[in-house]
Amino acid sequence: MFVTSPDRRLFPILLFILLFAAAVASAALFAQSSPLPNRSDSLKFAAIGDNGTGDRPQYEVAQQMTRLHSEFPFDLVIMLGDNMYGSQRPADFTRKFEQPYAPLLSIGVKFQPALGNHDTPEQIFYKPYNMNGQRYYTYARNNVRFFALDSTLMDRKQVAWIESALRDSREDWKICYFHHPLYSNAARHGSSVDLRTLIEPIFVKYGVNVVFSGHDHVYERIQPQKGINYFVSGAAGQLRPGNMRRSSQTAASFDQDQSFMAVEISGTDMFFQAISRTGKTVDSGVIRRQGQAR
């Protein structure tokens, strides 16, 4: 019997078919397993807090972020303060930021930090942080206006700026993020009541929808307060296991492993997912603008 060898010209075609099938299957699996709809025209971003340790857990969270990006192509990461612990020399910026997030940085994902109490003021001049020399600043993506604040030094000048910037914003969504949480039920730090008294009335007056903070090394979603949805996500590097003290304010919490958040905003909906260092979904839901999480 005479057997002919396969036509080599078919190999590229077969390879394309196999890769396309794998991509479709992977996308289908993501759609089935993820609470995020992954719509083509939505705003997608990640949130990390208290991440800059340079230790193995930080790198493992970063690896989960990279895996997520392959299916959920976010192009923004908001950083909730304590972006770097300990010494903050050039070598530390390499080990505690550039190396763990290299796969994301290399494809153009933009990191936008807020300062925490462990961060040196000089961080505002570090080019990959995109702060442009400002302790607090605002920027817009799609129909969302972000406000990155410096809660460590909340002086009168910043408070006046917050009110002016919120008043002038015209986007549908207003999201504020900063380090010290206005609401937290973690034992170590808890709620920053003085800060809440100072800035929450401004948030309410001008219709802030969502607030992200860190500082407590846990994940917590707070029941909506005065129409605002609050998240604490301070465990992307540091962790305090067993530190949560749940109360009636706590909608969901997780303190058994490091974690980060993935967020998608589409129209009047904000979908969110809290993901552990091992890739486990520890909380998820959707917020309707001017409504409550469900």
Functional labels for PLM-detected ranges:
Residues I13-A25:
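Bacterial N-terminal signal peptides
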Residues A27-D92, K157, N185:
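N-terminal active-site segment of His-dependent metallophosphoesterases
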Residues P37-R39, K44, T66, Y85-K174, ...:
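Extended active-site neighborhood of metal-dependent phosphoesterases/phosphodiesterases
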Residues G49-G52, L153, G234, S276:
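A mature extracytoplasmic/lumenal domain signature
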Residues D50, G81-D82, G116-N117, H179, ...:
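Active-site glycine-centered loops adjacent to acidic/histidine catalytic or metal-binding residues
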